[in-house]
Amino acid sequence: MAKTSMKAREAKRAQLVAKFAEKRAALKAIIASPASSDEDRWDAVLKLQALPRDSSASRQRNRCNQTGRPHGFLRKFGLSRIKLREATMRGEVPGLRKASW
């Protein structure tokens, strides 16, 4: 199990990403636009750098919903490989069963 503080940190990052998503997108559009002047582009870069570091979506880490485990995460199920196997063995995942050949 991951530490509670790590789970809380990821939740805080998710809130920051949601809060600043529109602002980041607008600034990135100005930076990428060929129509914007160099001065406008530079101002947008400085404003983007002034935003909180954790407001970037790339800072988020996928974690297991049950344990908070960061590795072996399966995006389709939202679980780590270990918890997915346990749930599958109990028959809690519809249409999924252990391979046998």
UniProtKB/Swiss-Prot annotation:
A single cellular component GO annotation: small ribosomal subunit
TM spans (from-to): none
Classification via SUPFAM superfamilies: Glucocorticoid receptor-like (DNA-binding domain) (SSF57716)
Keywords: Ribonucleoprotein, Ribosomal protein, RNA-binding, rRNA-binding
Pfam families reported in the protein's UniProt record: Ribosomal_S14
Record GO terms (molecular function): rRNA binding; structural constituent of ribosome
UniProt keyword annotation of GTP-binding present: no
GO annotation (BP), single: translation
Record keyword RNA-binding present: yes
Recorded family membership: Belongs to the universal ribosomal protein uS14 family.
HAMAP family: Ribosomal_uS14_1 (MF_00537)
Subunit and partners: Part of the 30S ribosomal subunit. Contacts proteins S3 and S10.
Role summary: Binds 16S rRNA, required for the assembly of 30S particles and may also be responsible for determining the conformation of the 16S rRNA at the A site.
Name used for this protein in its record: Small ribosomal subunit protein uS14
